[in-house]
């Protein structure tokens, strides 16, 4: 089939127009820049996962493959001009299993996680991630634990297996106890699965707090610039001797300590900036 006369010229003009339009949108529209950056962020992770899969497949499903993923993802913060400052890393217990609990703000949490991720540590993620193309397969090969949150019985069974794995294989797990991303600049109530897990295995809980991203990232405002994020590792919370009845108080105590630190590092000029001081940020009423 032949193209009508002038079709090639028209396609060339459309291509040139697109080349001119993209830079214009980039420099003149913060919203367009936000979508471009997020699209590249997700696409780049999927591409890196494609590269990681053959390397990880040599070992099969193995926690050690998380080191490969971490190595391949660490550079992303430089692409976006995000400086990640880690404090308190000495609080990680050196030679025992434990449960990490961290606040969950957006997919950018991956940058802070990779910066501070301890050895033999894998995240617990929602099962939907398993079907996220190359990223899902790479995560599976790295030993990420997937849970179907809609099926409570299955989730409890998986957590019981994880408790045994913690003790027998010296593995650490990373959990986002809020259960979902929280964009409002505070912390959602904690789900108790991670705390039941720690109490069942009688291993410590290591809280990790990432400062607010509001100075450089806001989904609602379609804003994504460069900035700094502080990741604070808090002292481990022991669970020896605790029973299931102690879990609610334990979860509340850990959340309170994390929220206090979150407010501190998100307003001191070294973390997420002064968002919490602004109208609409987290004040006493937001708690």
From Swiss-Prot:
The name this protein goes by in its record: 1-acyl-sn-glycerol-3-phosphate acyltransferase alpha
Entry text on domains: The HXXXXD motif is essential for acyltransferase activity and may constitute the binding site for the phosphate moiety of the glycerol-3-phosphate.
Membrane topology: Multi-pass membrane protein
Side Lumenal, residues: 27-37, 149-192
Residue numbers on the Cytoplasmic membrane side: 59-127
Motif segment (HXXXXD motif): 104-109
Gene Ontology molecular function terms on file: 1-acylglycerol-3-phosphate O-acyltransferase activity
Segments carrying motif EGTR motif: 178-181
Residue stretches in coiled coil: none
Taxonomic lineage from the root: Eukaryota, Metazoa, Chordata, Craniata, Vertebrata
Transmembrane segments annotated in the record for this chain: 38-58, 128-148
Biological processes annotated in GO: CDP-diacylglycerol biosynthetic process; phosphatidic acid biosynthetic process
Catalytic activity: a 1-acyl-sn-glycero-3-phosphate + an acyl-CoA = a 1,2-diacyl-sn-glycero-3-phosphate + CoA; 1-(9Z-octadecenoyl)-sn-glycero-3-phosphate + (9Z)-octadecenoyl-CoA = 1,2-di-(9Z-octadecenoyl)-sn-glycero-3-phosphate + CoA; 1-(9Z-octadecenoyl)-sn-glycero-3-phosphate + hexadecanoyl-CoA = 1-(9Z)-octadecenoyl-2-hexadecanoyl-sn-glycero-3-phosphate + CoA; heptadecanoyl-CoA + 1-(9Z-octadecenoyl)-sn-glycero-3-phosphate = 1-(9Z)-octadecenoyl-2-heptadecanoyl-sn-glycero-3-phosphate + CoA
Pfam families linked to this entry: Acyltransferase (PF01553)
Main location: endoplasmic reticulum
């Amino acid at each position: 089939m032949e193209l009508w006369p002038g079709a090639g010229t028209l396609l060339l003009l459309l291509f040139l127009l697109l080349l001119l339009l993209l830079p214009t949108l980039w420099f003149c529209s913060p919203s367009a820049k936000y979508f471009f950056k997020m699209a590249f962020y997700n696409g780049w992770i999927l591409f890196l996962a494609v590269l990681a899969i053959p390397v990880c497949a040599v070992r099969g499903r193995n926690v050690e493959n998380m080191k490969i993923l971490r190595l391949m993802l660490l550079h992303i913060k430089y692409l976006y001009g995000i400086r990640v400052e880690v404090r308190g890393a000495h609080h990680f217990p050196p030679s025992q299993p434990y449960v990490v609990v961290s606040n969950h703000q957006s997919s950018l949490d991956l940058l802070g996680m990779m910066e501070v991720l301890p050895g033999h540590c894998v995240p617990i993620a929602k099962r939907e991630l398993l079907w996220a193309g190359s990223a899902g397969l790479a995560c599976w090969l790295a030993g990420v634990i997937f849970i179907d949150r809609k099926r409570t019985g299955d989730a409890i069974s998986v957590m019981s297996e994880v408790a045994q794995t913690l003790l027998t294989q010296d593995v650490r797990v990373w959990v986002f106890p809020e259960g979902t991303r929280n964009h409002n600049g505070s912390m959602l109530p904690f789900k108790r699965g991670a705390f039941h897990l720690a109490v069942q295995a009688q291993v410590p809980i290591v809280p990790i707090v990432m400062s607010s991203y509001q100075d450089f990232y806001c989904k609602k405002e379609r804003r994504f610039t460069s900035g700094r994020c502080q990741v604070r590792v808090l002292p481990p919370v022991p669970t020896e001797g605790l029973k299931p009845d102690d879990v609610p108080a334990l979860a509340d105590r850990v959340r309170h300590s994390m929220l206090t630190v979150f407010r501190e590092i998100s307003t001191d000029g070294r973390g997420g900036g002064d968002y919490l001081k602004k109208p609409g940020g987290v004040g006493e009423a937001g708690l």
